[in-house]
Amino acid sequence: MKVVFLEDVKGQGKKGQIKEVPTGYAQNFLIKKNLAKVATAAALSEVKGQAKAKEKEEAELLAEAKALKEVLEKDETVVEIKMKVGQTGHTFGAVDKADIAKALKSQFGLKLDKRKIQLINKIQALGTKDVPVKLHRDVTAMVKVKISEA
């Protein structure tokens, strides 16, 4: 019996895949547990429609990420964070992902999830540093972060 998988089934098939499976297995397990349905013309067109919608949504997300990358990589987009500095020139504390995200929102109105900022070590020195931001799996932007004395 030909079925269209509605969810991933280990060892059988992935979501949206059309596959020939034993009739008993299809009727008693896959269809009963709503993991698959019989591959009729209506079911096939529904799966194709879902695939097109998912593809369109993915393209929109990619375009949005590319537009945000353009904004973040402009020369005038420099995130400035002020820190207290001791007499020896060392900073008190460090700048982390959350601080950068908060500064982006307050200075440029860009709401960015701190988990997308790819900062390996906290910034503890004065100066300018390029910080990578992963906006999409295919799009990574570099943000300039300037740490200055308060």
Curated annotation (Swiss-Prot):
GO terms for molecular function: rRNA binding; structural constituent of ribosome. GO terms for biological process: translation. It comes from the Bacteria. GO terms for cellular component: ribonucleoprotein complex; ribosome. Disulfide bonds: none annotated. PROSITE patterns: RIBOSOMAL_L9. Keywords: Ribonucleoprotein, Ribosomal protein, RNA-binding, rRNA-binding. The keyword Glycoprotein does not apply. Binds to the 23S rRNA. Belongs to the bacterial ribosomal protein bL9 family. This is Large ribosomal subunit protein bL9. It comes from Lactococcus lactis subsp. cremoris (strain SK11). The lineage of its organism: Bacteria, Bacillati, Bacillota, Bacilli, Lactobacillales. The gene is rplI.
